[in-house]
Amino acid sequence: MWELSIEQDDCYTDITVSDEAGNVLSLDEGCYRVGTACTVKYKIAVDKKPCSRGAFVVEGAVSEDLKVTEKEGYFCCSLTGIDSDTNLKLKNKAPNVLDFYFKDNTYSEYLIGNKNDCSGIIFHVGAGEGDNISDYDGKLTEIHGYVFAADPSGIQFGSIKEWCTETYRKELIGTHEHPDDWCGYANTKMILNHAKLKGITLSDDNYTHIYRATNYTIRTAPEGTSGWYLGSKVQMEAVAEAHDIGIKDRLQECSDAELWRRDSHHWRHLGTSTERNVTNSKGYYGIYDIEDASAAREGYKDYGEDPTPVLTF
């Protein structure tokens, strides 16, 4: 028998160790007595989220990399080929771009459990320039990063539609004032408040893109996050830039949707919440959308785009 000791960060709780037959083992002087294989199960403390689903550092001899699975409300990892005393460290790994983000407000570098439980993919870590924690109405105490929804909004709402309907295209609401800030949440809130002051009930038949982004329900926005909103110009540029480092492949792991045009593998036109203080010949105000990898198109409010939302965690 070998000694297995476990050290864990404080976000992990309810740790149990079982042998190959499934028998739960008891601590013996701070260690578990194990054979050549065992399974470690644990949960994540709700008040410690957002956090990693678990990253393991092993000191000792085991035969394979440790990967986490999910079963019956626990996260699990199996150790095999144990042939010496082993110290297992369960670490709360910091988030990285391209990590999967899950509806329980956790993240992982690989897909764990049901892919439909994945809210989306992290496309930026840390607070973006111009984003302010005070804009989030007390929903967040810190900005850890940003997540792009796993499925296009068109799956829920149908075909691509213009930024807003004709009645509202000659309005300049004010989101044009910060074109280079990560302020999609503040922009979205400004547009929602504008509609409210006008006595408008938000729907697909007025401020279409804001309605679709904030009413998106195909993938869950976890409690403890901002909730879904329509990203700003620079936020959606960052999503497109992530194309070059593999966000397309990550999205396709957790979604069956066609996220790029089949002919050239470019992005769909992604809608943004950032206006432009210019008008076209019809008097319609401008809007930015994302036409290609990292390229913002100078469009107008009668242009059709896909307003797939983002969230802040």
Give residue ranges: language-model regions.
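Short, compositionally biased
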Residues: 91-224, 304-312
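Short, surface-exposed beta-strand/turn "edge" patches of beta-sheet domains
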Residues: 62-83, 284-301
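Conserved N-terminal submotifs of small, disulfide-stabilized extracellular modules
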Residues: 1-31
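An exposed tryptophan-centered "aromatic clamp" motif
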Residues: 192, 198-229, 233-303, 310-312
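Conserved "repeat-terminator" motif of extracellular CCP/Sushi domains
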Residues: 1-9, 70-94
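Extended extracellular/luminal ectodomain segments enriched in beta-structured repeat modules
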Residues: 35-37, 225
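Surface-exposed interfaces of beta-sheet-rich extracellular modules
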Residues: 6, 37-78
